[in-house]
Amino acid sequence: MTLRVAWGITGSGDLLPETVAAMSALSETQDVEITAVLSKAAVKVVRWYKLTERVESFAKAVLIEEDANTPFIVGRLQIGRFDCFVVAPATANSVAKIAHGIADTIITNAVAQTAKSNTPIYVLPVDQREGTTVTTRPGGERLELAIRAVDIANSRALAEMEGIQVLAGPEEIADAMRECSRRRSEQQ
């Protein structure tokens, strides 16, 4: 049975190419149907990284945020039309909002409302470890960023939230989808 995945993308360039590659590989190796949900910021960043066509090539649908509740993805997540919700990569801003109950974008609202249901949520925060991280800019140049203590604290708070599983990296997405599939099988 096809696994139906809602994939929320925020405005992070960090881990974006790796996440797109992981989701693309998932679509090729597992029986999944992916609906991409892009925040307003994600549209710009995905375009900046020249990944729009790649996402469109494997996603069944690509939904673009108009406001926090449009397109209306929340209802489909709550009633089980999707087997799980993956938010990857998640910016420090989105993680902070989720951790503190702010639901003012399509992604943060979808997480807040989905957490009230039985639909599993998997989130990949970009800022999880102390120190510096090296990411790649759209042109391939390296960019070193210092991770703020507040962002790490918000990622930890997110990990403590009921119904949300924090992923350490894009390489954990396939395992999370296998877990989601197993959970769905147990519920049937």
Regions found by a protein language model. Give the residues of each.
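A cross-family phosphate/adenosyl-ligand binding-site feature
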Residues: 1-188
